[in-house]
């Protein structure tokens, strides 16, 4: 049966995440002084990371939280994407919802019906994916620290907003280098060799 934000049937409640429902809090949540961008306040390095429910996904988060807290729900199955980000997305929702119920992992490499049935028949303990979750946390926090601190630093130095990121800035640099190489290209004569063989 389709309900608002989930499906129910055969002893299961099935719901979904819409991207990252829970995200790292902005600097001003840690301290109001960070509302104003100042080089004197850099670097911003949280001692205890804080998370907020994304404004655009509050409704779906609320649905997930209620489902997790239902008294007839004994355990949770993490069926998010099989990868680092899927692990992070689920666990942040689970933690932010204050859920303490046991959870297992459905790991799929195919969306075919047989593969899904096989996956449910062999659910994995959540602890098998702790390292994947920790890797995702490291990536997320590194992105935040580089993005927040470098963007604020270079925006202050430049005098207007300038976005800097762990991935986007090196890619932009490679694009600029390639564009400069194309602009500086000078055509040169070249020769090809033809070889005619006779038996």
For each predicted feature, which ranges?
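Prokaryote-biased recognition of long, low-complexity C-terminal linker/tail segments
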Residues: 143-199
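Intrinsically disordered, low-complexity regulatory segments
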Residues: 1-140, 144, 170
């Amino acid at each position: 049966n389709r309900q608002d934000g989930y499906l129910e049937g055969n002893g299961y409640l099935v719901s979904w995440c819409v991207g990252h429902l829970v995200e790292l809090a902005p600097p001003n949540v840690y301290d109001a002084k960070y509302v104003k961008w100042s080089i004197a306040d850099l670097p911003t390095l949280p001692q205890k990371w804080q998370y907020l429910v994304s404004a655009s996904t509050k409704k779906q988060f609320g649905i997930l939280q209620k489902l997790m807290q239902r008294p007839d729900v004994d355990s949770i199955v993490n069926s998010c994407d099989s990868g680092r980000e899927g692990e992070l997305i689920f666990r942040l929702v689970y933690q932010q919802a204050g859920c303490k119920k046991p959870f297992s992992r459905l790991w799929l490499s195919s969306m075919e019906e047989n593969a899904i049935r096989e996956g449910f028949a062999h659910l994995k303990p959540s602890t098998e994916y702790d390292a994947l979750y920790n890797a995702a946390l490291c990536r997320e926090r590194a992105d935040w620290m580089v993005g927040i601190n470098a963007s604020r630093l270079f925006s202050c130095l430049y005098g207007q907003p300038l976005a800097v990121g762990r991935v986007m800035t090196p890619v932009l640099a490679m694009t600029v280098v390639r564009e400069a190489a194309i602009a500086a290209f000078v055509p040169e004569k070249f020769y090809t060799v033809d070889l005619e063989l006779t038996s």
